[in-house]
């Protein structure tokens, strides 16, 4: 099913219902090799198990990037064993992009890490991702 949405004065035509109903989370992958979440001092994402979310990402170039032009990564790992969550290994190009994802069904602590060596500060590019029941 297709729905019509008016956002910020612009008519968005033909968006699938899943996108229209998804919770939007604004993420910045910044030039200082840090994740930032709109409205939060400490970056953390808190979501419900199985929830549909739309990651609205602004990616800013740091000091280095991949050959394919990716400047930051966003990989979701289970905190307990650091294994990847399927479908959550994203690469960001410069600028704005959106990713529709379903939150894992297993409640618990996860961590988001950058998988692109974006600068000397790359190891510090991570944030908490909590899945609530």
Give short role names for the model-derived ranges:
Residues 2-13:
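Bacterial N-terminal signal peptides
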Residues 15-133:
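Extracytoplasmic copper-binding redox domains, predominantly the cupredoxin/blue-copper superfamily
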């Amino acid at each position: 099913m297709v729905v019509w949405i008016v956002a910020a004065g612009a008519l968005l035509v033909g968006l699938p219902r899943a996108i229209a109903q998804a919770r939007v989370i604004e993420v910045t992958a910044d030039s200082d090799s840090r994740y930032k979440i709109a409205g939060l001092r400490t970056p953390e994402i808190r979501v419900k198990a199985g929830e549909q979310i739309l990651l609205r990402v602004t990616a800013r170039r740091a000091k280095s990037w991949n050959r394919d032009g990716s400047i930051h990564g966003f990989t979701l790992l289970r905190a307990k064993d650091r294994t990847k969550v399927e479908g959550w290994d994203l690469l960001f190009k410069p600028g704005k992009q959106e990713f529709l994802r379903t939150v894992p069904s297993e409640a618990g602590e996860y961590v988001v890490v950058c998988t692109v060596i974006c600068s000397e500060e790359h190891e510090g590019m991570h944030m908490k991702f909590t899945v609530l029941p």
